[in-house]
Amino acid sequence: PEQNLLIKGLRLIREHYALPHLYISLHKQIPSGAGLGGGSSDAAHTMKSLNQMFNLGLSDNELEERVTGLGADCPFFVRNRPVFATGIGNIFTPIGLSLSDWHLVLVKPDIFVSTKEAYARISPRRPETPITDIIRRPVEEWKDLLTNDFEEGVFALHPEIADIKARLYDQGAAYASMSGSGSSVFGLFRTVPEETDMRRLFPESFYFQALL
């Protein structure tokens, strides 16, 4: 428990503010080892909640600065908005991106991807077209332009993850990608996929589907 990001976030707040004894219950629905920032979002939301509950008066900028010490991706979860991240992932530029009315399919196989190993295998490349320009284009044009540099190394280790991405495209996804360092893969669909059929394609995986 002492290494839990949620507990670390609570400690960060307690370094500067006197809080009463607390009972915190976490109902975790984001799968672990999925490349979805589950632990980081838990920590960020805990600090946001404490700020609101006890009227600590911390601005979003201050919260982002404080949670950076818990992990490079923690600040991203302080605000619910699309951003372009630079630095170590903690310097944000808001972007005008809306995926409203797109259908999201998320598939997380029973595979754990070591973040350390994923980083060791990465070959970063500067895209020919800046990412900020790519995302201004229609989603249907992202497929060959918007890439995840982690995929090459992770797919070599776990071809099953590459297969999930291919199957999402086969089922009509306009865009599909591994999330972060894996192992989950998401697809964006213009029309709603038949959920029963989709679940049959991924019987051993965590499956989630939603309208954005």
Give, region by region, the residue ranges found by the protein language model.
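Glycine/threonine-rich beta-strand-loop-alpha-helix active-site module
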Residues: 56-94
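Short hydrophobic/aromatic beta-strand micro-patches
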Residues: 186-188
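N-terminal beta-alpha supersecondary unit
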Residues: 1-20, 31, 120, 140
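Conserved, helical-rich catalytic subdomain that frames metal- and/or nucleotide-binding sites
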Residues: 78-175, 190-202, 208-212
